[in-house]
């Protein structure tokens, strides 16, 4: 259905809308209109403010409609849009004009459910306090205040790749009952501010929301140009690579049963990626040092004025966060202390789903690993890159750009040997 624009002067305040004076263009059916509350989420970055407003609006829209009994092909092509023209609102709260689009809302709603993430918890984790910027290998990378979700800014090409593979991904998640090392994709959005489009993917954080990671590796099983740069190595938590792992004689210490389960899961996931002709993925490996982890860390101040959030969509948010994350009874990580006290290096597996306990007596307290960068398909560009690298390094070199089947075999061989 085509979107239609309503002049700002005559537009009523839509359900979840920011208030009088807004014009909306929406693919969704007409909703019951309500007046907005006074407080509005304040974010220093307009893009982040609009993104969080849009997520709250979207979750509220979904909450008005029961989930479908089954997903249909059209659900994988659907989208929900809203266009806001606001001439009576102050720019320190939200921009005067913006657009927000959610891709395949019913599909991602279903995926969140299969990953045991409640929509209200998803909303609280994303919007109770502003997400913080963190270092990413490429593009913008944000992490939710409770450290359970990551928000990655991606390209329009990545969105197209996600669209083309979403049905296969969903079928695989259904088949494996959500028990996978693949990224848990939870939402896909477009935010338009000042006529500039930004694309956001929301995923579950692969690292612990409670335990800090002290060493981090990005492993592909390739050895050519797979060493962290000097610039990277001086960072507080550098992303090290395959050659760094070998040069440091790093090993992963987990029990035999945990190793068996992990490798079986990894092999199954990689076989799925080969079927989709996907390559260039990595194993993201994070290691928590139990000795360093027991040292007290300073808590940063909480900016209460930036923690105010009424939901903007007739969803009254929880009170402002006080203290460190992980103490709230709401949000994805909110129940961490409600079952039992956690000792040094311990975690709740239903929250830190990518975690594996280290073997008894191991120098590390916990290991976190999952597959990342799974959107690269072996297309004409990759074929050309493979040919160029083969000429430069020779046919036998361990370059990263190879056929998907060859990439998978080399990757699995390398990962199988990282354990003590």
Swiss-Prot record:
Phosphorylated, phosphorylation is induced by EGF. GO terms for molecular function: 1-phosphatidylinositol-4-phosphate 5-kinase activity; 1-phosphatidylinositol-5-phosphate 4-kinase activity; ATP binding; identical protein binding. The modification Phosphoserine is found at residues 26, 349. One of its GO terms (biological process) is phosphatidylinositol phosphate biosynthetic process. Keywords: Acetylation, ATP-binding, Cytoplasm, Endoplasmic reticulum, Kinase, Lipid metabolism, Nucleotide-binding, Phosphoprotein, Transferase. It catalyses: a 1,2-diacyl-sn-glycero-3-phospho-(1D-myo-inositol-5-phosphate) + ATP = a 1,2-diacyl-sn-glycero-3-phospho-(1D-myo-inositol-4,5-bisphosphate) + ADP + H(+); 1,2-dihexadecanoyl-sn-glycero-3-phospho-(1D-myo-inositol-5-phosphate) + ATP = 1,2-dihexadecanoyl-sn-glycero-3-phospho-(1D-myo-inositol-4,5-bisphosphate) + ADP + H(+); 1,2-dihexadecanoyl-sn-glycero-3-phospho-(1D-myo-inositol-5-phosphate) + GTP = 1,2-dihexadecanoyl-sn-glycero-3-phospho-(1D-myo-inositol-4,5-bisphosphate) + GDP + H(+). Widely expressed, with the most abundant expression in kidney. Its EC number is 2.7.1.149. Interacts with PIP5K1A; the interaction inhibits PIP5K1A kinase activity. Phosphatidylinositol 5-phosphate 4-kinase with low enzymatic activity. May be a GTP sensor, has higher GTP-dependent kinase activity than ATP-dependent kinase activity. PIP4Ks negatively regulate insulin signaling through a catalytic-independent mechanism. They interact with PIP5Ks and suppress PIP5K-mediated PtdIns(4,5)P2 synthesis and insulin-dependent conversion to PtdIns(3,4,5)P3. This is Phosphatidylinositol 5-phosphate 4-kinase type-2 gamma. It comes from Rattus norvegicus (Rat).
């Amino acid at each position: 259905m085509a979107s239609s624009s309503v002049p700002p002067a005559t537009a009523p305040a839509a359900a979840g809308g920011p208030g009088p004076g807004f014009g909306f263009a929406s693919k969704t059916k007409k909703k019951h209109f309500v007046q907005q509350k006074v407080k509005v989420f304040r974010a220093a970055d307009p893009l982040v403010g609009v993104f969080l407003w849009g997520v709250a609006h979207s979750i509220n829209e979904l909450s008005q409609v029961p989930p479908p009994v089954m997903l249909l092909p059209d659900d994988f092509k659907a989208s929900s849009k809203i266009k806001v023209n606001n001439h009576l609102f102050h720019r320190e709260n939200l921009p005067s004009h913006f657009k927000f689009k959610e891709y395949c809302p019913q599909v991602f709603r279903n995926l969140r459910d299969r990953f045991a993430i409640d929509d209200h918890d998803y909303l609280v984790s994303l919007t109770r306090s502003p997400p913080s910027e963190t270092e990413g290998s490429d593009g913008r990378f944000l992490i939710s205040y409770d450290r359970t979700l990551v928000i990655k800014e991606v390209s329009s090409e990545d969105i197209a790749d996600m669209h083309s593979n979403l049905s296969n991904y969903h079928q695989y998640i259904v088949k494996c009952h959500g028990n996978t090392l693949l990224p848990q994709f939870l939402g896909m959005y477009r935010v338009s501010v000042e006529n500039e489009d930004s694309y956001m993917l929301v995923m579950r954080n692969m690292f612990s929301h409670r335990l800090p990671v002290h060493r981090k590796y990005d492993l592909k099983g390739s050895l050519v140009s797979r060493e962290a740069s000097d610039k990277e190595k001086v960072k507080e938590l550098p992303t090290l690579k395959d050659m760094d792992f070998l040069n440091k004689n790093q090993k992963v210490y987990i029990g035999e049963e945990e190793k068996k389960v992990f490798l079986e899961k990894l092999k199954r996931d990689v076989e799925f990626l080969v079927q989709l002709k996907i390559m260039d993925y990595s194993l993201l490996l994070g290691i928590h040092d139990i000795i360093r982890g027991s040292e007290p860390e300073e808590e940063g101040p909480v900016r209460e004025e930036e923690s105010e959030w009424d939901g903007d969509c007739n969803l009254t948010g929880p009170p402002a966060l006080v203290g460190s994350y992980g103490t709230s009874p709401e949000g994805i990580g909110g129940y961490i202390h409600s079952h039992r006290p956690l000792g040094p290096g311990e975690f709740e597996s239903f929250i830190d789903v990518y975690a594996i306990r280290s073997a008894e007596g191991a120098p590390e307290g916990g290991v976190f690993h999952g597959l990342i960068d799974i959107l690269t398909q072996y297309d004409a560009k990759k074929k050309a890159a493979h040919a160029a690298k083969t000429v430069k390094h020779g046919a036998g070199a361990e370059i990263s750009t190879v056929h998907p089947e060859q990439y998978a075999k080399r990757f699995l061989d390398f990962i199988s040997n990282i354990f003590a």
